[in-house]
Curated annotation (Swiss-Prot):
This is Ras-GEF domain-containing family member 1B. The gene is RASGEF1B. Residues 204-452 form the Ras-GEF domain. InterPro entries: Ras-like_GEF, Ras-like_Gua-exchang_fac_N, Ras_G-nucl-exch_fac_CS, Ras_GEF_dom_sf, RASGEF_cat_dom, RASGEF_cat_dom_sf. Interacts with Ras family proteins. Interacts with CCDC124 during cytokinesis. Residues 34-164 form the N-terminal Ras-GEF domain. GO terms for biological process: Ras protein signal transduction. The keyword Cytoplasm does not apply. It comes from Homo sapiens. Its main location: other. Induction: Up-regulated in macrophages stimulated with IFNG, GPI-mucins or bacterial lipopolysaccharides (LPS). Keywords: Endosome, Guanine-nucleotide releasing factor.
């Protein structure tokens, strides 16, 4: 079965250099290079550049970049149809009398292209039209005399089906978790005193909690497809008069679920701090989360770290001055400094580069962990997308932009494939994922109940919240 190399080896500081690989420029035309780097091309020429022939196979960096960015201009099923057509027509796979020797040369290359597509962008094949075209082309390859092709085609299809089945199962679990926490949220809003447990009774060790948070982060990262970063920003293609790509719906559900997890963790932290009646218990909870956040930093789990800091900086928590007076904040100040947004998160980006470098030379799974602050990664990709046009004035696809986009996404692809080395604790994971959390209003109410309002505005809000949430005046 054809194997693909790791993502970390795909991109260097420049784009795809045609001197390193055989180029199809002469045969398809319409591609523009500068200093041997592909900068732009017509969409049709770029599609032809994707399709292998007897003497040519596209560089894997080009395959990833084009499959990632092409969805800004056309649906994946439309691209697959064109690829199939080119494979069949150009390589005469539809002709039973075609040269068998040529077939032996081209079949493994087409199979390799299909394998790379199904391995890297498996979610494209949830579309029946994609799967139909894939099966048709795979059948043409497998119907040859070489038994190896049949075996490899079968392995490719089985691997794809396993991935799609795992995705469906994951989505079912997410839906179940979401419904569980939502059902109980109503009870929590109206009767906050009914909640007995807190996070420390479930897990009194901050290091263990940081490890369990890392489990959740890596699992959710793993299910985000690279295409979701592009599909989140899909807009109407100016050369497409009829429709925008993905007009049916933006297929970004796993990316959105991950962002929702960040928000949930922030609210969970704030809830756990605001819930205790006694000041010393609230102070203890703050110090507990500071230790959890510090361990997240040490692990390389920057997303959980930022979610915890965000929760502790929410107004209902930060206003608890008497509680904070009992807290040793030196460690928290250091963590806040690391995640300081000034100078475009310079300190965080420096720490992220350090973690990424550690990951490259890692001797253990733990050292490989890099979980970026996800909202900032999305923001970086958004500004890259907004800052450069998809097409040049001559109608060419601006491929220089997409090299940079693919470089950012491919780094993420490397990080998301790391296996979590820590032992799973189902009880702790269940609590983190399903325990009810306060809404913003409920957080303010709990905060005012703990440390009374300090001015008339807070007093009026407190009365309003007591009336709306508790039915009291």
């Amino acid at each position: 079965m054809p194997q693909t190399p790791p993502f970390s080896a795909m991109f260097d500081s420049s784009g795809y250099n045609r001197n390193l690989y055989q180029s199809a420029e002469d045969s398809c035309g319409g591609l523009y290079y500068h200093d041997n780097n592909l900068l732009s091309g017509s969409l049709e020429a770029l599609i032809q550049h994707l399709v292998p022939n007897v003497d040519y196979y596209p560089d894997r960096t080009y395959i990833f970049t084009f499959l990632l960015s092409s969805r800004l201009f056309m649906h994946p099923y439309e691209l697959m149809a064109k690829v199939c057509h080119l494979c069949v027509e150009h390589q005469r796979l539809s002709d039973p009398d075609s040269d068998k020797n040529q077939m032996r040369k081209i079949a493994p290359k087409i199979l390799q292209l299909l394998t790379e597509w199904t391995e890297t962008f498996p979610y494209d094949f949830r579309d029946e039209r994609m799967m139909r075209n894939l099966k048709d082309l795979a059948h043409r390859i497998a119907s040859g005399e070489e038994q190896t092709y049949r075996k490899n085609v079968q392995q490719m299809m089985q691997c794809l089906i396993r991935k799609l089945a795992a995705l469906s199962q994951y989505e079912e679990v997410l839906a179940k978790i979401s419904s569980t926490s939502t059902d109980r949220l109503t009870v929590l809003k109206t009767k906050p005193q009914s909640i007995q447990r807190d996070i420390i009774t479930v897990c009194n060790d901050p290091y263990t909690l940081a490890q369990q948070l890392t489990h959740i982060e890596l699992e959710r990262l793993n299910y985000i497809g690279p295409e979701e970063f592009v599909q989140a920003f899909v807009q109407k293609d100016p050369l497409d008069n009829d429709k925008s790509c993905y007009s049916e719906r933006k297929k970004t559900r796993n990316l959105e679920a991950y962002v929702e997890w960040f928000n949930r963790l922030s609210y969970l932290v704030a809830t756990e701090i605001c819930m205790p009646v006694k000041k010393k218990h609230r102070a203890r909870m703050i110090e507990y989360f500071i230790d959890v956040a510090r361990e997240c930093f040490n692990i390389g789990n920057f997303n959980s770290l930022m979610a915890i800091i965000s929760g502790m900086n929410m107004s209902p928590v930060s206003r608890l001055k008497k509680t904070w007076a009992k807290v040793k904040t030196a460690k928290f100040d250091i963590l806040e400094h690391q995640m300081d947004p000034s100078s475009n998160f310079y300190n965080y980006r420096t720490a992220l580069r350090g973690a990424a470098q550690r990951s490259l030379t890692a001797h253990s799974s733990r050292e490989k962990i890099v979980i970026p602050f996800f909202s900032l990664l999305i923001k970086d990709i958004y500004f890259l997308n907004e800052g450069c046009a998809n097409r040049l004035p001559n109608g060419h696809v601006n491929f220089e932009k997409f090299w940079e986009l693919a470089k950012q996404v491919s780094e993420f692809m490397t990080w998301k494939q790391v296996e979590c080395p820590f032992e799973r604790d189902r009880k702790i994971l269940q609590y983190l994922l399903t325990v009810p959390v306060f809404s913003e209003d409920a957080l303010y109410l709990a905060s005012y109940e703990s440390e009374g309002p300090e001015n008339h505005i807070e007093k009026d809000r407190w009365k309003s919240l007591r009336s709306s949430l508790l039915g009291r005046v």
